[in-house]
């Protein structure tokens, strides 16, 4: 993310580190939208307002220039794309309500719960698991911002603070199952959810064998809230994301826009012809072209490919641009990776297509 790009979206900037303010000052000639520069450091550099002096001089109440509406932008995330600069995902004030399902149902939280989500604060997943849905459910939230991840440290925190609910990417659980779990008292842990990447069945089975806990998978994007999930009342199918969240009209479609049948692959889409559902983003900020590419004619295209079984469960294949096409077959990297992960010598693996003159890839 370039300083120029970031400043181009802002009306006011607040920074404290001198090395950052130097970059900001250099970017100002190409950032006409910035009207105010504010320093929160001990001394305001030339051209910056002093934040602390401004607070002291400010009136106790200032009437807003315009009343807020549900449609106003409440927060924005950066999300990387496969090409070009990162996209800025804008959500409106209905976004937190979209996470009621996340906290109360997928995380299965009660007022007595102590929930831990492992995600850096700057990620969209942080508010998925540390803020909106959990607070709406009235649950307690345990925040652990580790400088360096170690499986032992996570297990110690669960033991010492009696964490009851844990949400983390599958990679975290891949490390946990290689620890000696008998060294820790994990009796408080009741429920575990995973998101951020597809779950290999081997990890599901091993963790269940060691702890007795089933990993409940979920799928969503920075642009959405929980979109597909295995809920508490559902029987998980290892490797499957689960069923669509009822708050979204989820479908799988082929390149011709046709809804696919069971066993067929299709892109995961959200139909919005009847209205924008709670939790779906408002737009890619100041980028009408990218917004239209992803969301047009009453359909939001996630860019992710899956297939569904006879029970309606969705199985992740990969990004639409990551699917390997070989000899006329469409091969999902996750399927091959899951097979490799069953070997005890394999901790992590990644599959990608290589150009081939005969097979295509």
Which residue stretches match the model-derived regions?
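Conserved AMP-binding/adenylation subdomain of ANL enzymes
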Residues: 97-114, 121-164, 179
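Conserved AMP-binding A3 loop
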Residues: 74-98
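Conserved ATP/PPi-binding loop(s) of AMP-dependent carboxylate-activating enzymes
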Residues: 247, 258-293, 331
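Conserved loop-to-beta-strand segment in the C-terminal subdomain of adenylate-forming
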Residues: 32-36, 264, 355-361
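AMP-binding/adenylate-forming catalytic core of the ANL superfamily
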Residues: 1-6, 11-18, 166, 290, ...
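Gly/Ser/Thr-rich phosphate-binding loop
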Residues: 53, 136, 163-168, 177-237, ...
């Amino acid at each position: 993310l370039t300083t120029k790009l970031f400043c181009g979206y802002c009306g006011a900037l607040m920074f404290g580190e001198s090395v950052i303010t130097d970059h900001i000052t250099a970017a100002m000639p190409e950032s006409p939208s910035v009207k105010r520069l504010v320093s929160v450091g001990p001394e305001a550099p030339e051209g910056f307002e002093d934040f602390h002096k401004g607070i002291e001089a400010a009136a106790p109440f200032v009437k807003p220039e315009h009343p807020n509406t549900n449609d106003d932008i409440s927060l924005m995330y950066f999300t990387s794309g496969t090409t070009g600069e990162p996209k800025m995902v804008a959500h409106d004030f209905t976004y937190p309500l979209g996470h009621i399902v996340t906290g109360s149902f997928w995380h299965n939280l009660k007022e007595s719960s102590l929930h831990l989500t492992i995600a850096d604060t700057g990620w969209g997943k942080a508010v998925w698991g540390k803020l909106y849905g959990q607070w709406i459910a009235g649950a307690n939230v345990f925040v652990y911002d580790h400088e360096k991840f170690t499986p032992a440290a996570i297990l110690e925190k669960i033991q010492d603070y009696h964490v009851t609910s844990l949400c983390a990417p599958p990679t975290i659980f891949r490390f946990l199952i290689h620890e000696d779990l008998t060294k820790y008292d994990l009796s408080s842990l009741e429920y575990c959810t995973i998101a951020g990447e597809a779950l290999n069945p081997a990890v599901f089975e091993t963790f269940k064998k060691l702890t007795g806990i089933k990993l409940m998978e979920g799928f969503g994007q920075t642009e959405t809230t929980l979109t597909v999930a295995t809920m508490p009342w559902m029987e998980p199918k290892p490797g499957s994301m689960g069923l669509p969240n009822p708050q979204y009209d989820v479908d799988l479609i082929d390149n011709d826009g046709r809804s696919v049948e069971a066993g067929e692959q299709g892109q995961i889409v959200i139909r919005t012809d009847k209205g924008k559902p709670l939790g779906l983003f408002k737009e890619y900020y100041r980028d009408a072209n990218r917004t239209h590419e992803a969301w047009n004619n009453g359909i939001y295209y996630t860019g992710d490919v899956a297939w569904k079984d006879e029970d309606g469960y969705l199985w992740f294949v990969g990004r639409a641009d990551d699917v390997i096409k070989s000899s006329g077959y469409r091969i999902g990297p996750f399927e091959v990776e899951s097979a490799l992960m069953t070997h005890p010598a394999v901790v992590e693996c990644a599959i990608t297509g290589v150009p081939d003159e005969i097979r295509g890839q």
